Amino acid sequence: MSYQPSLRAMTAKTYGNHSRIEGGDVKGLNVLLLEDHISTGLSCLDAIRALREEGAEVTQVMSITNYAIPETMRLFEEQSIQTYDVIRFDRVVKKACEMGVINDEQAALVMEWLNTPWTWAAMHGVVAIAREN
């Protein structure tokens, strides 16, 4: 198994080949995108779009942590992207509850936010500035 590391940039460089992709040509390569964290997924999906525009095949993303917000997961499904993660946030909440860091009521509130963050924010008087992570 061989691989060629390629890094992504949020915006195209203003010099050189003006590419968002560094580390070599990705055309025709099957790319596994690695992320530290997925919240809304928008920056990750933007990177996938950039890689696909350069000819890469991207069908999988792996992250260390993932909120796994239902709306976010639907966005990945719509793009035929399978997500893998080391730790989902619901496990963090469960462990915090087990350790006594938060109680059951607090855990339920966090999980309510996690399942519908924008609706939850509106219901609790929080103004969501953007849906970007």
Regions found by a protein language model. Give the residues of each.
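Short, glycine/charge-rich flexible loops or terminal/linker lids adjacent to PRPP-binding catalytic cores
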Residues: M1-L32, T40-D46
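PRPP-dependent phosphoribosyltransferase catalytic core
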Residues: R49-N133
